[in-house]
Amino acid sequence: MTTHSPVVTVDGPSGAGKGTLCMLLAEKLGYNLLDSGAIYRVLALAAIHHGVDLNSEDALVPLAANLDVQFKAEGELVKVILEGEDVSAELRKEETGMAASKVAALPQVREALLRRQRAFSAQPGLIADGRDMGTVVFPNAEVKIFLDASAEERANRRMKQLQQKGLDVKFDRLLSEIQERDDRDRNRAVAPLRPAEDALVLDSTSMNIDEVVAQAITFIESKL
């Protein structure tokens, strides 16, 4: 085993199951957890709480650099703790998402958050969940996993999730939305969605979560 803090990155498209896999890996290994998809929402929420102008890079950069946030895997949920307060529910609000879009458009803020994300690497290790963790944020990570699944399977999983919440959704619409997002993510100019060259590509289309976790653990153990 390595004596420093190992980093395990898990990248992949929307709906592939990264969040669930990362939570289970963090729990099984006792590692720290980084949910990079939530980091801009967390910063936006911190700015709102502190009355910081969402268009001011000068004010947002120090806030991003010193962002006091923890991600805790609890059962099937990731609890997000901002400055000691559970803000998981607030993060899901539409206004938080809109504010996150504003701060994410500022280059210096993105750079500050990149450094802040790297600071999550600490003993005993880190599970980093995102889209460019293995290619941009932690290019030197010891273990890189790219979790994929067919667009049809991801749409089907999403439909089941929404139906369990009592929502009436159409499969074709969900599939179209996923395909459009895939296209945007894979063809964007900055940090396009792609597996790192040294990543294990796991296709979870016909696998259950236990099988995915087992393969991931085997790969992690072979690398550390």
From Swiss-Prot:
InterPro entries reported for this sequence: Cytidylate_kin, Cytidylate_kinase_dom, P-loop_NTPase
Bilayer-spanning residue ranges: none
Reaction catalysis annotation: CMP + ATP = CDP + ADP; dCMP + ATP = dCDP + ADP
Highest rank taxon of the organism: Bacteria
One matching Pfam family: Cytidylate_kin
Keywords: ATP-binding, Cytoplasm, Kinase, Nucleotide-binding, Transferase
GO molecular function, one term: dCMP kinase activity
UniProt keyword Nucleotide-binding, yes or no: yes
EC number: 2.7.4.25
Enzyme class: transferase
Major localization listed first in the record, in broad terms: cytoplasm
CDD domains cross-referenced by the UniProt entry: CMPK (cd02020)
Family the entry assigns: Belongs to the cytidylate kinase family. Type 1 subfamily.
NCBIfam families per the UniProt record, alphabetical: cmk
Protein name: Cytidylate kinase
Organism: Aliivibrio fischeri (strain ATCC 700601 / ES114)
Lineage, uppermost ranks: Bacteria, Pseudomonadati, Pseudomonadota, Gammaproteobacteria, Vibrionales
